[in-house]
Design a protein with these regions (language model features):
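Detector for C-terminal structural segments
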Residues: 196, 270, 294-323, 363-373, ...
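A structural "hinge/loop" feature
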Residues: 37-53, 77, 103, 155-164, ...
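Ligand-site clamp/hinge motif
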Residues: 206-252, 382
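Surface-exposed binding/hinge segments that line
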Residues: 23-24, 82, 127-171
Length: 508
């Protein structure tokens, strides 16, 4: 297999500088973007999954966007907003916007979307994320109010994520969710073209987009699970943008004459979850701490990722607005790990654990998981690594059927609530830890604190509390490496939005 991969890349390097297929796409104003997996659905506000939403967002808009440099909230379908009182936010909506089917966007669209999310019958993953919203009230055709159960200063951050993409109310009533799943209808810069399962999703330019039509006529998202296959396709000119170029292949891409690596420090964090939500060794904090001491994060960063990551000590990265620098890293200490296991009456030589990992979703995820297994093997622990297809991996986490540990990334949350609330409370979809009432109470209080200074202090206290519980092995803030064809003018963003509305043809 290694020889096959070598010859695939070699053949790509020997191909013409701009293959015929790439030349044809350039003339047709089409870009092909490769992701590791296909979308899990095309129905918005359904599944919390970056890969899915990165594609779906090309067809659907939100009320609020983020500035691509500062990541502060900026207008999208809402032109402005204000706090009326502690439990009321008012949004003024953009007029003259139409869905792809001609249906007008207005206050009814906002209310219908929120009602759909909160309806238990629809079983959306986002329902819990909007639990503080009591209702959306229509003030007039282009003004809405979000009424919350308690003060919620973080609402504007939540609304700028993928949590509430606007759906057309008439089409939703007439065709139902299955109709919009088969043929998405949003207000976004691209319209649905076709979805060929296990192969590609095609979106085409919306010439009537309210912000101005995109330069690209067509964007094709191809689904290529393996890093090596994505790399070979990039160098052969079969694709134009790939995420997660393996660190060892950076020079190969840069010297190819066909593409370059464009890097950014991501808001995404990577971690090893230690599952405490069912009976097992991870329910003992001494075992969790022992595993954290036994894993050498610095070694993983240097030897596997070649330095392309920033070590973390707690649940938030420095890019997060609520990050606390006071949280200290748990040091790599084999003797301490052994002592903790001994105090827990566990013989490491008889301890067998299972680690679930995706392959191709995050930078060298499978390799990292195997390296972690090897490190734990140094103190006698046997770790069986289970490699999952991406959708299967998420389903196992959601259904609580993973092994004792799982590898996952989280982002692009830029505030504490969107990470800590979602991942350290047992009722949440992707959590691995829960049942800590003092922590739950602190989280519930922090979310409602209006004073910015007091809120920051509350989240700092929570970060320290989380770190002391060792619910994860805190790994790193991800560095994103994109391979981009030389004829495309596009720059990556820290929030991982592969936004083709911003892409242009650099040379003709």
């Amino acid at each position: 297999m290694r020889f096959l991969k070598f010859f695939m890349v070699l053949a790509a390097l020997l191909a013409p500088a701009l293959p015929a297929a790439a030349q044809s796409r350039m003339k047709a104003e089409e870009v092909v973007v490769a992701f590791a997996a296909e979308p899990r659905t095309l129905l918005p506000v359904t599944i919390v999954d970056w890969t899915t939403n990165n594609m779906v967002e090309h067809m659907y808009d939100r009320l609020v966007d983020r500035d691509p440099k500062t990541y502060k909230p900026i207008p999208m379908l809402a032109t402005s907003w204000k706090v009326v009182d502690n439990t009321t936010w008012e949004f003024s909506l953009r007029s003259g916007v139409k869905f792809h089917n001609g249906e007008p966007f207005d206050a009814q669209s906002v209310k219908a979307t929120m009602d759909y999310i909160k309806d238990p019958a629809n079983k959306t993953h986002y329902a819990s994320r909007w639990s503080l919203v009591k209702e959306v009230q229509i003030v007039d055709p282009y003004t809405v109010r979000f009424i919350t159960e308690k003060p919620w200063p973080g609402l504007i951050d939540r609304i700028s994520l993928s949590d509430m993409m606007m759906m057309p109310p008439k089409a939703l009533r007439a065709e139902g969710p299955q109709g919009l799943l088969a043929k998405p209808v949003g207000t976004g810069p691209f319209k649905f073209g076709q979805w060929v399962r296990d192969e590609k999703l095609v979106v085409v330019r919306n010439d009537d987009y309210w912000k101005g039509k995109p330069e690209l006529k067509t964007v094709t998202f191809r689904f290529i699970p393996e890093f090596s296959a994505r790399l070979a396709a990039l160098l052969a000119g079969e694709i134009d943008i790939m995420k997660d170029v393996p660190p060892h292949a950076v020079d190969l891409v840069d010297k190819s004459g066909k593409a370059t690596v464009r890097a950014t420090v991501s808001s995404r964090i990577n971690y090893l979850a230690l599952v405490t939500l069912r009976p097992g060794p991870m329910q003992d904090i001494r075992v969790r701490q022992a595993i954290a001491h036994a894993i050498n994060v610095d070694e993983l960063i240097q030897q596997v990722l070649r330095g392309r990551a920033s070590k973390m000590c707690g649940p938030l990265s420095p890019i997060n607005v609520d990050f606390s620098p006071k949280v200290q890293c748990l040091k790599h200490d084999v003797k301490q790990a052994q002592a903790l296991l001994k105090s827990a009456n566990i013989d490491p030589g008889r301890l067998v654990l299972t680690l679930d990992t995706p392959s191709g979703r995050y930078p060298l995820d499978k390799d990292i998981s195997q390296a972690i297994a090897a490190q734990l093997g140094r103190i006698g622990i046997t770790v069986n690594v289970v490699v999952n297809e991406w959708g299967t991996h998420l389903d196992k986490i959601k259904n609580r059927t993973t092994g004792d540990m799982f590898f996952l990334g989280w982002g692009p949350a830029l505030d504490a609530q969107n990470t800590i609330e979602q991942l350290f409370q047992g009722s949440m979809t992707y959590s691995s830890y829960g049942g800590n009432k003092p922590l739950d109470d602190k989280i519930a209080t922090a979310i409602t604190i209006v004073d910015p200074k007091k809120r920051l202090e509350a989240w700092a206290d929570i970060q320290q509390m989380v770190a002391s519980e060792a619910p994860w092995v805190f790994l790193w803030q991800q560095h994103d490496l994109y391979g981009v064809a030389n004829w495309i003018d596009w720059q990556p963003r820290a929030d991982e939005k592969v936004w083709m509305y911003e892409a242009k043809i650099a040379k003709r």
